[in-house]
Amino acid sequence: MITITKLNDQEMVINCDLIELIETTPDTTITMTTGRKVIAKEPVESVLSSIVEYKKKLYAK
């Protein structure tokens, strides 16, 4: 699970295993496998870094 910030400054925790696509249009748009789309304030690189850090913690156990 990673935390992102929506455009209205509300934080949201999403399951990164359900992310299908991340686009910059110019905002960062995260499309989930369920079809739901979330627009995040963080740039794509930041979202990807959050996913990598989460996976490192998860598999380090």
What are these regions (language model features)?
Residues M1-V13, D17-K61:
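Eukaryotic intrinsically disordered, low-complexity regulatory linkers and tails enriched in Ser/Thr/Pro
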